[in-house]
């Protein structure tokens, strides 16, 4: 699968990740945030890595743009999100990784997608690492 965007989201959902979970040698999840202006759900496919029990790491890179991705800005308004990994859908709380944990998480993510290091060189902003922590009922 070479897509990444709305069609990626639609195929991922329709097949419970059979199409879309594996993407260019990586694994992706679907992150649904609440739009900070619209209040509407916004879903984005993102490369991820497990970060411990019930935790997953994603990178707010936007390809090295000087502006952060909209989904990251949405988290500032409402850190409670929905995550889908294959057929597993769950609520999670998102937080930006702290300075003590970020280097190891960044290294793990850059091993998954080496372009992250290049993205950081392209921008003056510090690209955040985001931790998604599954919420238990």
Q: What are the language-model segments listed below?
A:
Residues 7, 132-134:
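Long, non-globular segments of proteins
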Residues 1-5, 33-40, 80-89:
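N-terminal short leaders/motifs
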Residues 1-27:
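Extreme N-terminal tail/first-helix region
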Residues 26-61:
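Short beta-strand segments
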Residues 51-53, 88, 137:
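Short strand-connecting beta-turns/loops that link adjacent beta-strands
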Residues 28, 127-129:
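Short hydrophobic/aromatic beta-strand or adjacent loop that forms the aromatic wall/cage
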